[in-house]
């Protein structure tokens, strides 16, 4: 490899690393208005099916999510609006806690995300890894390919099957985090341990929605 090519690759890698530091970490895209967790929560509110939301939290946290969801149904007028918001905040907070992350409120729509996170969602939506070309280091590419395959295989599932939905979410989270450069990102198990599947979506879990 020529010195010029080596320098070019080094600069490119450095720019990608800087982008990850300047923009918010991949795990944070789950606490934005545009992210997959809020989108799943809104699907639950619109459809009346709380399972869309439950896929994003541990089984141990289901009761708290169900209680917040029930409060929405019981609310009227302004009370309903407030209950909607509390439900979404409860959902995101518990999802974040399941990943060992803190929660300081849902970030506004349009909050910048690392390019690899946006591209990972786009790749899953289109069924092609092309959007991620040039955003992932060569030594991590095979790992991305494997995680993409797992997330793609699990994204279509019966919404009534929570273990399957949580497996999809786990696979999704693992894929996106890894694509963004976060370690081996075995979040799936860590996040939705009960699902043992690695974690999310898609269907709803997607985050395609997501993201």
Write out the residue ranges for each language-model feature.
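Repeat-mediated protein-protein interaction surfaces in helical alpha-solenoids
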Residues: 18-25, 46-49, 96-104
């Amino acid at each position: 490899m020529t010195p010029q090519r080596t320098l070019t690759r080094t600069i490119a890698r450095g720019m990608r690393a800087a982008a990850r530091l300047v923009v918010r970490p991949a795990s944070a895209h789950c606490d934005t208005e545009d992210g997959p967790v809020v989108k799943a929560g809104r699907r639950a509110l619109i459809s009346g099916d709380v399972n869309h939301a439950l896929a994003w939290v541990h089984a141990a946290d289901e009761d708290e999510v169900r209680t917040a969801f029930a409060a929405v149904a019981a609310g009227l007028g302004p009370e309903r609006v407030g209950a909607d918001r509390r439900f979404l905040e409860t959902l995101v907070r518990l999802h974040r806690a399941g990943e060992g992350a803190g929660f300081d409120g849902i970030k506004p729509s349009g909050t910048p995300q690392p390019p690899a996170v946006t591209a990972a969602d786009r790749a899953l939506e289109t069924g092609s890894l092309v959007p991620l070309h040039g955003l992932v280091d060569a030594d991590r590419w095979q790992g991305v390919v494997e995680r993409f395959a797992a997330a793609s295989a699990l994204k279509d599932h019966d919404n009534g099957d929570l273990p399957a939905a949580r497996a999809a979410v786990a696979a999704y989270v693992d894929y996106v985090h890894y694509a963004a450069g976060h370690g081996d990102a075995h979040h799936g198990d860590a996040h939705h341990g009960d699902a043992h599947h690695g974690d999310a979506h898609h269907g709803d879990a997607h985050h395609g929605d997501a993201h």
